[in-house]
A protein has these predicted regions:
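Terminal, membrane-proximal amphipathic helices
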Residues: 1-40, 117-169
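Transmembrane alpha-helical segments and their cytosolic interface motifs
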Residues: 35-61
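Alpha-helical membrane-protein architecture signal
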Residues: 43-47, 78, 126, 130
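Hydrophobic residues within alpha-helical transmembrane segments
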Residues: 47, 51, 81-85, 134, ...
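Membrane-water interface at transmembrane helix exits
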Residues: 49, 69, 98-106, 147-159
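Alpha-helical transmembrane segments
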Residues: 53, 90-94, 140-147
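Transmembrane helix boundary and interhelical junction motifs in multipass membrane proteins
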Residues: 55-96
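Juxtamembrane non-transmembrane "cap" segments at the membrane-aqueous interface
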Residues: 92-118
């Protein structure tokens, strides 16, 4: 199962205690349940990571995911790693899709024309901040709910499958 792979990849709590950068969060980051791999913490971690990934706040997504993980006792490493769904390669298509989605709800049409002069996408996008934020929030909610439900369903399926194999022996 993916649980065993994740356990091998993720750091152990003892090694986390020695990391200087994590001391900023204080003793809250050292709660053992933030580092355990179980159905509740993994599904919460996926939901938080997916939620933060689609918010249009690059650079702050990981900090927000860490804070929400501590608040809701979710798997901290998973939540932080999943914020990288939006990375330098995927950010522009996700922003475009978020603006399109937001535009549908507030009846704003999005047309972007690339000029031959200087391309400054972020300055040009400021005129579309309303559909961007609304669309990003909608994508965040949908992706977090879907990831939470799908992880819970997969976990249940895997446990049932494992138990049925044990019964055969």
């Amino acid at each position: 199962m993916a649980k065993n792979v994740i356990k091998r990849i993720f750091p152990k709590l003892d090694s986390v205690k020695e990391e200087k950068i994590l001391k900023v969060f204080g003793p809250a980051v050292l709660q053992p349940n933030l580092w355990h791999i179980n159905k509740k913490s993994v599904s919460r971690g996926f939901a938080i990571g997916a939620f933060c990934a689609f918010l249009p706040i690059p650079g702050i997504q990981m900090i927000l995911a860490a804070f929400l993980s501590i608040t809701f006792a979710a798997n901290l490493p998973l939540a932080v790693i999943l914020t990288w769904i939006t990375n330098p390669f995927t950010y522009i298509p996700i922003v475009y899709f978020a603006i399109k989605i937001g535009g549908i709800f507030i009846n704003a049409e999005f047309t972007y024309e690339i000029k031959n002069e200087q391309i400054n996408i972020f300055t040009d996008l400021m005129q579309y901040w309303e559909p961007l934020f609304l669309g990003s929030f909608i994508l965040s909610i949908i992706s977090s709910l879907l990831s939470y439900i799908l992880i819970r369903m997969y976990w249940r399926y895997y446990v049932i499958k494992t138990w049925s194999k044990r019964k055969k022996f």
